[in-house]
């Protein structure tokens, strides 16, 4: 119910003695002033009867949860101008929408493909606040009031949180250069991913409604093998392209949407369906391994067979020759 004009006029024109009356009345209520026969006696020398009644009514309204409203604030308290407050509300609404989108797209991860328009909107609102000059002096401009006026800096914290989340998700890898739409490679990968999941669902045996309820997945492994191999090959190509484009930044990833989609597919294929894709390079790898293993044996065997076998010749020592010749001389002399 809206207050009448008389009450509104009385609130807008509060007498100057009212703060003093409230202070004394609160002191009496808290026991700071001595009690007499009645509270009127305490204020008899300070306030008239009518003024005292007004103080009592106002004190009761404050104790019951009422307040003085904006009139209780100092008249020189700085406040935002309408244009700056509108910028703050725009940023608040955009932040709320982006936060809801991020939470709803957490599992399965769809952050980049679902929330990129809202992220661009938040970035735009933050740029508007940073560039706002306000209608007052430079020291109290809109940007300074919203971004640097207090220790918490809530607007700055929210903006940094959104930017950090976007960078860690590497959503720029899923978008075009101007970040206005999904890239062609991302759209193609997501289409193959949806096609592979559709193949899984159509080839499940039985009437189960969930991927995790059936036990026989032979039809899934047989009929969806090509779809899975195509998706896996495309993912490997995207990884190689990303590594070539980011040579100066090792450890970069694809966007979180693509990585999570591939992880889901591999988990279903390997763990849930227990399928396996035979490697076409198995035979050449085994042949090369066996050849390298027996190469030393072949080398030493061929060396032994083709080397010249020389007979051993006994060579007598020189001392033995001299002693033999000396013995012959003695025999001849005798």
Swiss-Prot record:
Glycans are attached at residues 93, 128, 135, 163, 177, 184, 194, 216, 263, 274. Keywords: Glycoprotein, Lysosome, Membrane, Osteopetrosis, Phosphoprotein, Signal, Transmembrane, Transmembrane helix. The modification Phosphoserine is found at residues 322, 325, 333. One of its GO terms (cellular component) is lysosomal membrane. It comes from Homo sapiens. This is Osteopetrosis-associated transmembrane protein 1. Chloride channel 7 are heteromers of alpha (CLCN7) and beta (OSTM1) subunits. The gene is OSTM1. Residues 1-31 form the signal peptide.
């Amino acid at each position: 119910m809206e207050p009448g004009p008389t009450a509104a006029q009385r609130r807008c024109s509060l007498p100057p003695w009212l703060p003093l009356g409230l202070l004394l009345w609160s002191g009496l209520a808290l026991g700071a002033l001595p009690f007499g026969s009645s509270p009127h006696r305490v204020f008899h020398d300070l306030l008239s009867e009518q003024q005292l009644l007004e103080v009592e009514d106002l004190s009761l309204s404050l104790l019951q949860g009422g307040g003085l409203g904006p009139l209780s604030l100092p008249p020189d308290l700085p406040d935002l101008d309408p244009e700056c407050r509108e910028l703050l509300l725009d940023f608040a609404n955009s932040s709320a929408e982006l936060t809801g989108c991020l939470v709803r797209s957490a599992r399965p991860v769809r952050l980049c493909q679902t929330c990129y328009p809202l992220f661009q909107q938040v970035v735009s609102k933050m740029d508007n606040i940073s560039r706002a000059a306000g209608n007052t002096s430079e020291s109290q401009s809109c940007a300074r009031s919203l971004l640097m006026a207090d220790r918490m800096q809530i607007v700055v914290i929210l903006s940094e949180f959104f930017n950090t989340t976007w960078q860690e998700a590497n959503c720029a890898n899923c978008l075009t250069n101007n970040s206005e739409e999904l890239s062609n490679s991302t759209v193609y990968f997501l289409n193959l991913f949806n096609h592979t999941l559709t193949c899984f669902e159509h080839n499940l045996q039985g009437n189960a409604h969930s991927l995790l309820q059936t036990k026989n997945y032979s039809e899934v492994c047989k009929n969806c093998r090509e779809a899975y191999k195509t998706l896996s090959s495309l993912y490997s190509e995207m990884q190689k392209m990303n590594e070539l484009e980011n040579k100066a930044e090792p450890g970069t990833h694809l966007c979180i949407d693509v990585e999570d989609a591939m992880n889901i597919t591999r988990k279903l294929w390997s763990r849930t369906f227990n399928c396996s894709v035979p490697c076409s390079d198995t035979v050449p790898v085994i042949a090369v391994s066996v050849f390298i293993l027996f190469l030393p044996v072949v080398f030493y065997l061929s060396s032994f067979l083709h080397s010249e076998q020389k007979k051993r010749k006994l060579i007598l020592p020189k001392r033995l020759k001299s002693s033999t010749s000396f013995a012959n001389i003695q025999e001849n002399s005798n």
